[in-house]
């Protein structure tokens, strides 16, 4: 029903947010390691 749809949307959004946050953290780490900040 509607609840499962909402749950699915929230999970998808959560995955995207986690991916974006993780990606930016990785970029910052690469930047610091390479000294290009």
Swiss-Prot record:
What is the top-level taxon of the source organism? Eukaryota
Q: Which UniProt keywords apply?
A: Amphibian defense peptide, Antibiotic, Antimicrobial, Disulfide bond, Secreted
Query: InterPro entries this protein is in?
Result: Antimicrobial_frog_2
Q: Where in the cell is it found?
A: Secreted
Which tissues show it?
Expressed by the skin glands.
- Choose any GO biological process term that the UniProt entry carries and state it: defense response to bacterium
**Chain's role:** Antimicrobial peptide. Active against the Gram-positive bacterium S.aureus (MIC=15 uM) and the Gram-negative bacterium E.coli (MIC=30 uM).
Task: Give an example GO cellular component term for this record.
Answer: extracellular region
Q: What is this protein called?
A: Brevinin-2DYe
- Cystine connections: 31-37
Q: Which family does it belong to?
A: Belongs to the frog skin active peptide (FSAP) family. Brevinin subfamily.
């Amino acid at each position: 029903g509607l609840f499962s749809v909402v749950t699915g949307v929230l999970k998808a959004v959560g995955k995207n947010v986690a991916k974006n946050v993780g990606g930016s953290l990785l970029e910052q780490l690469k930047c610091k390691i390479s000294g290009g900040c």
